[in-house]
Amino acid sequence: MSRDEIYRQSQSFLDDFGFGESVATVFDDMLERSVPFYAELQRMIAEMAGDFAMPHTRIYDFGCSTGTTLIGLDQAIGPRGLTLVGVDNSQEMLAKCRAKMAGHAFANAVELIRADLNQGVVMENASLALMILTLQFVRPLYRDRLVRAIHDGLEENGALVLVEKVLGESSLFNRSFIKYYYEFKKRNGYTELEIAQKREALENVLVPYKLAENLEMLESAGFRYVDVFFKWYNFVGIVAVK
């Protein structure tokens, strides 16, 4: 696994954060060192998927990146006649995904699709949809519409599993949670320069909502049951059932 050192050196000009080749190459390391309890989150997602993945349906992973979640789902669920559909807008991420998947003997069918979630989604025969640290990168203007489209594309009793970075409900807690998160990143080997430069690159690219705003968006989209299954300061996991 290549180590994430994209922001290791001081840069006089920072491009907006994107998912091109440089990020795709180190993305697995970036996630493991930047997302609290990342391995446990993956295990929990696969565990829940086992309850919602109906035989002979499709599971959509929107923002599948390098395929870690799809591989984990397939291993946990086993053969059910499913089609696992990975959707991403980055050609470089999809290339890394294909390469990683080549080393895994899948028990279910797999499809990879390039698509821009800002333009909506097309789903069929879907029992489960995943958005793991993805919705936060969709332009706020399109989020409500996207979540409604996912709800409408799910079969009855189908589920959406959503993991997001969130804002604190108050400015007091928000400042504290950000401070704790940066301390977490330092413990995982990131320098203050790396943290500051990545924060600047992500500004206006990653736009988090408050937890309450995400819950309201899911309920407004029509989901009957919505609950939080994971919370760590400014990271949250939500499951919603149609």
Curated annotation (Swiss-Prot):
It catalyses: prephenate + S-adenosyl-L-methionine = carboxy-S-adenosyl-L-methionine + 3-phenylpyruvate + H2O. GO terms for molecular function: carboxyl- or carbamoyltransferase activity; S-adenosyl-L-methionine binding. NCBIfam families: carboxy-S-adenosyl-L-methionine synthase CmoA. Belongs to the class I-like SAM-binding methyltransferase superfamily. Cx-SAM synthase family. SUPFAM superfamilies: S-adenosyl-L-methionine-dependent methyltransferases (SSF53335). S-adenosyl-L-methionine binds at Y38, G63, C64, S65, D88, N89, D116, L117, R199. CDD domains: AdoMet_MTases (cd02440). Catalyzes the conversion of S-adenosyl-L-methionine (SAM) to carboxy-S-adenosyl-L-methionine (Cx-SAM). It comes from the Bacteria. Keywords: S-adenosyl-L-methionine, Transferase. One of its GO terms (biological process) is tRNA wobble uridine modification. Its EC number is 2.1.3.-. It holds the Pfam family Methyltransf_25. Homodimer. This is Carboxy-S-adenosyl-L-methionine synthase.
